[in-house]
Structure formats: structure tokens, C-alpha cells
């Protein structure tokens, strides 16, 4: 096939730059795209030349050797092979392969060295991909997600969008300066991008899938339209994509700037995708409404509000542990957060904060981008996001601060629950900068055959909250993949020296004998946290009640109702549990049957960790209280009648349903 002739037929001969060529030839096109100054991309090759990273050439060499996501191909990349076929049988591996994120190290290495080996490898893989996955049959099939046997198809809208804005466009901005491009190379690449635009024009998820999909679809289509005005169809692409972007950038985020899926990773995916589209518009003189900029600013401020004392983000829903301090933000082998291209930094969370500072000037963005060295800490310690079901309290912003986060993921009615968990009133507790109670992570998706593991990591058992009768929170018979729980905040703030979050939810209302939990999460002066659980209901039947406590190390010891725990940094803590009904306790560490005692910091890796379950078989109502403190701290908690008494060297308080009072 002569790609050059086909491309020339598709060019807009009235485009001033094309018109100025006179007779259009392949060689002229190569020179033109190598040297063109407009339209303007998000960054230039000179920005990529500033990267300081000792390992990027080794990363690129692995790609040169076709060592990708832990699998080394024996020869050329086989685009239809999936190495998980005999284990997890996980489509996500192939979908990650199809996203071509590993072209980034090739482009980065070229920017630093100008070694044309990297260009040639990129071009070879680009041609190979297009030959393995020609778009024609998918362009004709208007089924939203074309049915394909394992390991799936390269032409889902999510992969199509991701390829465009995370690899194809950014690596082209770097590689276009190379001298090895032939007219056929360039034409094949641009025709490949045209295939992406045509597919996205004809296939739009429009909230039929997880809403992060459409952020990637719309941004990618708009970016192609802006960056390739030389193509006849680009005006139609622009008109469609511009409307979608400017509508969805507001529709997908709450007034607080929080993405509708309510999980940090996918929130950042959407924020970055939309921000790229907006910045590209501004760089090329295209109007952007005021609300769009403010949404992006607030979306970044939300991430700031979640950041823990160790400069990581909590694993709310399908989120890995993203760390500002490391070379890369996450540790996923594949299906990770790496869904952008920041030219000067491989850590997307850190680069995102720097970018937000450049765009908006808020000093907290600089504070996190520089790991507290510059800028200013946020002026607020505590955040109440009732609409979204996220609540955060802390003692300060330093590395030794106390931190308390609780969430009850609340999705809009009809929004698929794909990336949220059964986490209502989960407690994330950090004292003196040390993680104690944590979310267990996401581990793996239901696209794999390990659906039992997916179910476990999504369940209330894998969160620090109440689990009743093997009934998942908010489950309604006959209703699939909808998050039906709604949480009510009774109080958020300070009372008599205590910081209190007081919540209840409807997650067990559909049980034959309904159960109604209420939890007070209390920060006590002196690095102490107390959890008070009120569990109510008609009390007609016995239930299996379980309160879970998930830690992030295996250094957990259980003695009846007392737990000793040593943090990753070797700091000892202890927890005491009391109730007005008889509970039993159990410790699991890396148990497969029953499942329990696991943590996953990145997809698809899990490691053993301590999990304690406090169990009671009986009727509601009852009260339970848990105190979390440093080892040897004299603080205590006990139940007196219908109240809970907290004592420490900072004072004595009685906690009741109605509130809290110093005594």
C-alpha cells in the first residue's frame, strides 16, 4: 500500500501551509512536519531534554529488547499474545500493551541522546501495531465495544484515547525532529492517527462505561483535530470534540472539583486528560470558558486535600498508592496510573502538581511539587466533602502529623460502580506520620478470571468498617454494578478539644432484618484516634457482625481484644477494642482460605499484611469502641451505659449519640 498517496488525497489543499507547498510530495511533507511551528503542542523537545533520570536509557533498552510489562518477547512483539493466559487470564495486560505507553522511554531516550536507534524502534513498533490491528473492520462496526475473544481488542475507545494523548502525539513531538522518517513512515503514522479520530467519532461511551473513558476519548479527539488541521476532516472532528470537552469537563466533576467516580487515580486521569485539551486550546488561540479552568484547579486542590503525611495518596476505591517522593508515582506492573506524558519528570503526581502551579499559581501546588521545600502548605487541615462522601482531618501538614480519612463513596444514580468499593465509613488512620489502618488497595479487575479476588478487595472486609451477613454494602437484589449506599454526616468539626466525624449509612437497609450503622471517628489530642460504632436495627434476628482492621505490615499480634502493631518504619502502636456485647477476635496474615490479610499497592501485586476481625453473632443494637495509640500511651476507652468514656493525659470526655462533652 502506498500510504503517501492516500495521505495526500486526504489533505486540505486550501490549508495555507499545504497550499504553500505547491505540488505536494512525500519528501515535502516530511520536511514540513519536521519543521512546522504551528499548531503548538503541549511541550517541545527542548523540555524533554531537561529530564534528569539515571535509569531512562535502561528503560528504553528494555523496550528495544521487547521486554514489556514483565514479559520478554522472543523476537518481534506479538500483539495478540497475553502471558497471563495460564494464570489470571487478565485482559488488562493486553489492553496495557495496546496503549503503547512503553514508547515513552524510547522518545525520552531520543530526546537526551539523539540516537536514531530509538526512532527506528518506535517506527518499527508503530508499523507492527498497525499491521496487527488494522482499524478498518472496527470503523465499520458501530457496536460500542466490539466483542473479541481473550485477550481482547486494541480498538476499545479507552485504549484509542489513551494511545493518542499519552504516546502517539507526545512521542511524535519528540521524534518528528529525527532524520530517519521516510514519507511512508510519516504517512502511515498520520493515517494511523486519522483511524483513531474516525473511531472516536463513531464510538463514544457517553457515560455508558466508567466516566473516565469519555475524558480520554474527548480529549484525544480534540487534540488530533487541533494538531492536524492539514487533514480535510479535522474541522468536523474539532466541532464534535470541542463541544464534548467543554460540556463534560463540567458535567464529570462536582462543585468541589471531584470526579464522579470518586477515586484518586481515575480523578487524576480525567483531570489530566481535560487539562491537556484546555491547555492545547489556549496555546492555539481557542477559547476556553472560565468554568473549565476552575474545575481543573479545584480538581487539583482535591488531590492536595487527600495527601498523607508521607506524601502519598490514600487508596480510595480502585487506586494504587501514589507517592510524590519516588521516581514513579505508582508501582503497578501494568494498568498503572501512567496515563500522561510530562517531559521533565517521570513521577506523574509530582509533575501534575508542578503543572497546576504553573497554570494557577496556588502555592500549595508548589509545596507538594517540591516535597515541602517551597510554596506554602494548605491553609486548611480538615476537609468535608459530603456530596462525594469523603472526609479528612489532620493535625498539620508535616511528615509527623496525625491523619484521619473516612469515605463512603457516593456515586450519582446510574453511574456504574466500576471503580468504587464497598467502603462506607472506612477509617484510614495515621499517627505521628506512621500508617496504621489502611485501605487494602485494588489488586486486580474483574476482566481477569480471579473474580473472587476482585470481590474480596472491593468488599467491606478489605476496609476498616462493618461487614454484616456476607451482604455487600448497598446490595439490592436484581441491581448490578450500582453503588447504592448513601452516607449522612451528622457532625464534622471540633467539640471540646476533640475533632469528630459523625456518619451513618443505609448500606444494610435491605437485609431481612435491617441493620443501621453509625460511626464517630474521633481525633484525640496527643496522637490518639477513637472509633465509636453504634449498630442499631429492629433486632429480630441474629447476624454475623464483623469489624475489620487492615494493617500494612505483617508485624501484627493479637491477644483477645488487644492488638500490637509495628509500622513499616519500626514504630510500635497498639489498639484496644471494647463492646457491650461479646466479640471474638481473629488474625489473618496472607490467608487464601478464608481470604484476608492482604494489601495491594499496585496492580496486579498483592502481599501479606495483618488483618484483625472482631466478630459478634447476635442481635442489634450494640456499641463498640476502638482506641488507636502509640505503644505504652496511657489513653483508654471504656463503655459506661450508653456512653463511651475516653481518658488520656489531655483530658476526659464522654461520647454519646448526641455529641461529646469534656468531663
Whereabouts are the PLM-identified features?
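Extreme N-terminal leader/anchor segments
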Residues: 1-63
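Cytochrome P450 core scaffold surrounding the K-helix E-X-X-R motif
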Residues: 437-440, 444-448
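Catalytic micro-motifs at enzyme active sites that drive phosphoryl/nucleotidyl and oxygen chemistry
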Residues: 149-155, 414-417, 453
Amino acid at each position: 500500500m502506498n500510504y503517501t498517496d492516500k495521505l495526500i488525497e486526504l489533505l486540505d489543499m486550501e490549508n495555507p501551509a499545504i497550499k504553500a507547498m505547491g505540488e505536494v510530495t512525500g519528501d515535502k511533507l516530511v520536511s514540513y512536519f519536521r519543521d512546522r511551528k504551528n499548531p503548538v503542542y503541549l511541550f517541545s523537545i527542548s523540555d524533554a531534554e531537561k529530564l534528569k533520570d539515571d535509569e531512562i536509557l535502561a528503560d528504553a533498552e528494555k523496550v528495544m529488547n521487547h521486554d514489556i510489562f514483565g514479559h520478554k518477547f522472543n523476537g518481534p512483539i506479538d500483539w495478540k499474545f497475553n502471558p497471563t493466559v495460564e494464570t489470571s487470564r487478565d485482559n488488562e495486560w493486553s489492553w496495557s500493551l495496546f496503549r503503547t505507553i512503553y514508547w515513552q522511554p524510547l522518545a525520552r531516550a531520543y530526546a537526551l541522546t539523539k540516537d536514531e536507534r530509538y526512532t527506528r524502534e518506535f517506527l518499527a513498533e508503530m508499523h507492527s501495531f498497525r499491521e496487527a490491528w488494522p482499524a478498518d473492520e472496527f470503523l465499520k462496526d458501530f457496536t460500542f465495544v466490539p466483542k473479541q475473544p481473550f485477550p481482547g481488542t486494541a480498538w476499545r475507545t479507552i485504549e484509542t484515547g489513551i494511545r493518542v494523548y499519552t504516546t502517539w502525539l507526545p512521542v511524535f513531538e519528540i521524534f518528528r525532529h529525527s532524520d530517519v522518517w521516510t514519507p511512508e513512515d510519516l504517512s502511515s503514522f498520520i493515517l494511523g492517527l486519522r483511524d483513531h479520530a474516525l473511531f472516536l467519532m463513531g464510538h463514544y461511551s457517553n457515560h455508558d462505561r466508567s466516566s473516565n473513558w469519555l475524558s480520554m476519548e474527548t480529549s484525544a479527539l480534540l487534540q488530533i483535530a487541533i494538531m492536524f488541521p492539514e487533514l480535510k476532516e479535522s474541522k468536523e472532528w474539532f466541532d464534535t470534540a470541542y463541544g464534548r470537552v467543554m460540556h463534560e469537563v463540567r458535567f464529570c466533576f462536582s462543585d468541589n472539583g471531584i470526579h464522579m467516580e470518586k477515586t484518586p487515580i481515575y480523578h487524576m486521569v480525567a483531570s489530566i486528560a481535560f487539562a491537556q485539551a484546555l491547555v492545547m486550546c489556549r496555546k492555539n488561540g481557542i477559547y476556553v470558558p472560565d468554568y473549565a479552568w476552575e474545575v481543573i484547579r479545584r480538581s487539583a486542590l482535591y488531590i492536595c486535600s487527600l495527601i498523607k503525611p508521607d506524601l502519598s495518596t490514600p487508596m480510595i476505591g480502585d487506586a494504587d498508592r501514589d507517592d510524590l517522593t519516588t521516581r514513579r508515582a505508582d508501582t503497578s506492573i501494568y494498568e498503572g496510573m501512567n496515563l500522561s506524558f510530562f517531559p521533565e519528570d517521570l513521577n506523574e503526581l509530582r509533575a501534575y502538581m508542578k503543572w497546576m502551579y504553573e497554570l494557577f499559581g496556588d502555592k500549595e501546588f508548589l509545596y507538594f511539587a517540591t516535597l515541602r521545600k517551597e510554596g506554602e502548605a494548605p491553609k486548611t487541615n480538615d476537609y468535608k466533602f459530603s456530596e462525594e462522601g469523603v472526609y479528612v482531618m489532620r493535625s498539620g501538614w508535616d511528615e509527623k502529623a496525625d491523619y484521619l480519612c473516612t469515605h463512603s463513596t457516593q456515586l450519582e444514580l446510574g453511574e456504574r460502580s466500576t471503580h468504587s468499593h464497598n467502603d462506607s465509613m472506612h477509617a484510614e488512620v495515621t499517627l505521628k506520620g506512621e500508617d496504621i489502618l489502611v485501605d487494602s488497595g485494588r489488586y486486580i479487575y474483574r476482566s481477569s478470571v480471579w473474580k473472587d479476588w476482585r470481590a474480596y478487595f472491593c468488599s467491606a472486609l478489605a476496609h476498616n468498617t462493618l461487614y454484616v451477613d456476607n451482604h455487600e454494602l448497598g446490595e439490592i437484589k436484581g441491581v448490578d454494578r450500582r453503588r447504592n449506599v448513601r452516607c449522612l454526616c451528622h457532625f464534622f468539626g471540633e467539640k471540646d478539644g476533640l475533632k469528630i466525624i459523625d456518619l451513618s449509612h443505609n448500606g444494610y437497609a435491605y437485609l431481612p432484618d435491617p441493620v443501621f450503622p453509625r460511626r464517630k471517628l474521633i481525633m484525640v489530642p496527643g496522637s490518639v484516634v477513637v472509633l465509636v460504632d453504634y449498630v442499631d436495627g429492629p433486632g429480630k434476628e441474629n447476624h454475623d457482625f464483623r469489624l475489620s482492621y487492615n494493617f500494612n505490615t505483617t508485624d501484627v499480634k493479637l491477644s483477645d481484644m488487644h492488638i500490637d502493631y509495628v509500622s513499616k518504619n519500626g514504630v510500635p502502636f497498639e489498639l484496644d477494642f471494647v463492646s457491650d456485647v461479646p466479640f471474638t477476635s481473629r488474625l489473618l496474615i496472607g490467608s487464601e482460605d478464608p481470604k484476608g490479610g492482604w494489601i495491594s499497592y499496585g496492580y496486579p501485586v498483592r502481599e501479606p499484611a495483618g488483618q484483625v476481625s472482631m466478630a459478634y453473632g447476635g442481635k442489634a443494637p450494640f456499641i463498640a469502641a476502638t482506641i488507636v495509640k502509640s505503644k505504652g500511651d496511657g489513653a483508654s476507652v471504656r463503655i459506661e451505659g450508653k456512653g463511651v468514656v475516653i481518658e488520656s493525659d489531655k483530658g476526659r470526655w464522654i461520647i454519646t449519640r448526641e455529641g461529646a462533652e469534656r468531663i
